[in-house]
Amino acid sequence: MLQQRTLKSLTHAVGVGLHSGQRVEITLRPAPPDTGIVFRRVDLPQVVEIAVSATAVSDTTMASTIASGNVKVHTVEHLMSACAGLSVDNLYVDITAEEVPILDGSAASFVFLLQSAGIVMQNAPRRFVRLTQTVEVREGSGATEKWARLAPYHGYQLSFEIDFDHPAVDATGQRVVFDMSSGSYAKDIARARTFGFTKDVEMMRAKGLALGGGLDNAIVMDDYKILNAEGLRYDDEFVKHKILDAMGDLYLLGKPLLANYSARRSGHALNNLLLRELLRRTDAWEVVTFEDAERAPRGFAQLAPAW
């Protein structure tokens, strides 16, 4: 049987929020089968729990935010991406502020935390959402068109194409394909950092965004070049970060997908719109388990390898 997974022990990290600039502590704790991933605002007089789901997403401005009533947790996508990449199903995330820490701007630190705590099997079947028909959302037209699509696939494959019209980005790979059956999330995707442009920083900070951003947790570019002295971690780091974000956004569904995801110029908003369209299209998917692990897609039966 393909089983659900959680952590063997708890693990802890301290950092700042990318957009809020606030100091924040997170503690990742094991959770029972069928719990899902639950964020807990432990800084409030009464702890508020927010279970991840596509409909819990309340805002997608520059990040994915989940909410329960007026209580929110911002920028959950990098931690969610690490959970997706390492196939962690059940987890409590205790958090002391309203934004997940950005750490180094990628999912690598979250991968390290999860693997350091240890990932263990649980005595419950892992439930997948398997696509049976194609679901697609689009916005805009012509050169400004954005789209994202989920199609039937025996496994989990993601392909993404970017178009930023910037010399530093244009000099790198514009499209990447990642397949869970043949690639290593920790090695191939997790280290890709978020990125931004100096010309946007003043505007973002006027809106209360990017207050914790800098060269130590993002790739920063002026009009012509990358400002980080160390350069890129991957030749195609920009588009790989979009894959990283998409994996996190899609894992907010609450169950792992068996599908081919493909997108052009998509972001947090369109990814969530795609999930909501998927939920609306009840004819386009089914929930499946694998009693025989041999029948499961490659890449899901074993625990994810370390670095």
Curated annotation (Swiss-Prot):
EC supergroup of this enzyme: hydrolase
HAMAP family for this protein: LpxC
Name assigned to this protein: UDP-3-O-acyl-N-acetylglucosamine deacetylase
Listed InterPro entries: Ribosomal_Su5_D2-typ_SF, UDP-acyl_GlcNac_deAcase, UDP-acyl_GlcNac_deAcase_C, UDP-acyl_N-AcGlcN_deAcase_N
Keywords: Hydrolase, Lipid A biosynthesis, Lipid biosynthesis, Lipid metabolism, Metal-binding, Zinc
Enzyme Commission identifier(s): 3.5.1.108
Catalytic activity: a UDP-3-O-[(3R)-3-hydroxyacyl]-N-acetyl-alpha-D-glucosamine + H2O = a UDP-3-O-[(3R)-3-hydroxyacyl]-alpha-D-glucosamine + acetate
Annotated signal peptide: none
Family, per entry: Belongs to the LpxC family.
Presence of the UniProt keyword Glycoprotein in the record: no
Function: Catalyzes the hydrolysis of UDP-3-O-myristoyl-N-acetylglucosamine to form UDP-3-O-myristoylglucosamine and acetate, the committed step in lipid A biosynthesis.
GO biological process, alphabetically ordered: lipid A biosynthetic process
GO cellular component, one term: membrane
Pathway(s) it belongs to: Glycolipid biosynthesis; lipid IV(A) biosynthesis; lipid IV(A) from (3R)-3-hydroxytetradecanoyl-[acyl-carrier-protein] and UDP-N-acetyl-alpha-D-glucosamine: step 2/6
